[in-house]
Swiss-Prot record:
Pfam families: Ribosomal_S14. Keywords: Ribonucleoprotein, Ribosomal protein, RNA-binding, rRNA-binding. One of its GO terms (molecular function) is structural constituent of ribosome. Part of the 30S ribosomal subunit. Contacts proteins S3 and S10. GO terms for cellular component: cytoplasm; small ribosomal subunit. This is Small ribosomal subunit protein uS14. Binds 16S rRNA, required for the assembly of 30S particles and may also be responsible for determining the conformation of the 16S rRNA at the A site. It comes from the Bacteria. The lineage of its organism: Bacteria, Pseudomonadati, Pseudomonadota, Betaproteobacteria, Burkholderiales.
Amino acid sequence: MAKLALIEREKKRARLAQKYAPKRAELKAIIDDASKSDEERYAARLELQQLPRNANPTRKRNRCAITGRPRGTFRKFGLARNKIREIAFRGEIPGLTKASW
């Protein structure tokens, strides 16, 4: 199981990304707008750089909701592959069955 601090750090990153999403979108729209002057676009770029680093959604890592495992996590369930297997065998995920062909 991952350390609790790592799990909390990811939660903090998710909160920051959500908090600053409108501001980031506004600044990025100004930067991409060719009709704006170069000074306005440059000022928007500087302001974007001043936002917290963890406000960038690309820094967020998907982790298992149970164990905090960073790899092998399925987005659909929010769980790591080994936990999905355990829970599915117990029949706790509706509609999920073991493949057989």
